Swiss-Prot record:
Protein's name in the database: Thiol:disulfide interchange protein DsbE
Swiss-Prot/TrEMBL keywords: Cell inner membrane, Cell membrane, Cytochrome c-type biogenesis, Disulfide bond, Membrane, Redox-active center, Transmembrane, Transmembrane helix
Subcellular location: Cell inner membrane
Residues covered by the Thioredoxin domain: 34-178
Function: Involved in disulfide bond formation. Catalyzes a late, reductive step in the assembly of periplasmic c-type cytochromes, probably the reduction of disulfide bonds of the apocytochrome c to allow covalent linkage with the heme. Possible subunit of a heme lyase.
Pfam families tied to this protein: Redoxin (PF08534)
Residue ranges that the UniProt entry lists as topological domain Cytoplasmic: 1-3
Family, per entry: Belongs to the thioredoxin family. DsbE subfamily.
NCBIfam families, per database record: dsbE
SS bonds (residue pairs): 73-76
GN (gene name): dsbE
Transmembrane segments: 4-24
Length: 178
């Protein structure tokens, strides 16, 4: 009987260890977002420039990318020139400045240019939390009704845009046409 009492905890420990070990190799970019198919979460936040307050209603009307970024994010610095080029080509991009110092964000946008039609300031990270953001950069695709249709985790470079994301964005644009 005592031998059985020793085997059960050992078996449970090994089972937990296997699950934890397996979890180390899961790619967060491969995890589906719980927000896909749901309306963009409610929020009431200032712009980075502080000139007005935005809500989720401001994101409705046209398909867009919603890019989560921060000045402390090295990958965001790599991605930013590509976002500028996309904005110049007419891609609608909204930005969420995530858990960042607002003065640093203003300096960043002045120095590297602002690809965002709307720039939401999420200093405390609550909007990011409601979106299920793991870090930055993350980009959500929203339709004209403000529903999240897809999510991309990681740097959007020209190859990723061309090979993976451009068609998804164009499908949302085509869907919004009358």
């Amino acid at each position: 009987m005592k031998r059985w009492l020793m085997v059960v905890p050992l078996a449970l420990f090994l089972l937990v260890a296997v699950f934890l070990y397996r979890g180390l190799y899961l790619d967060p970019a491969e995890l589906p977002s719980r927000m896909i198919g749901k309306p963009f979460p409610a929020f009431n936040l200032p712009t980075v420039h502080g000139d007005k307050t935005l809500t989720q209603a401001d994101l409705r009307g046209k398909p867009a990318l919603v890019n989560v970024w921060a000045t402390w994010c090295i990958s965001c610095r790599v991605e930013h020139p590509v976002l500028n080029k996309l904005a110049e080509k007419g891609v609608v991009i909204y930005g969420i400045n995530y858990k960042d110092d607002n003065a640093a964000a203003l300096k960043w946008l002045a120095e590297f240019h602002n690809p965002y039609q709307l720039d939401i300031r999420d200093e405390d990270g609550n909007l990011g939390l409601n979106l299920g953001v793991y870090g930055a950069p993350e980009t959500f695709f929203i339709d004209a009704k403000g529903v999240i249709r897809d999510k991309y985790v990681g740097v959007i470079d020209e190859v990723v845009w061309r090979d993976e994301l451009a068609a998804k964005y164009q499908a949302l644009v085509d869907e919004a046409k009358p």
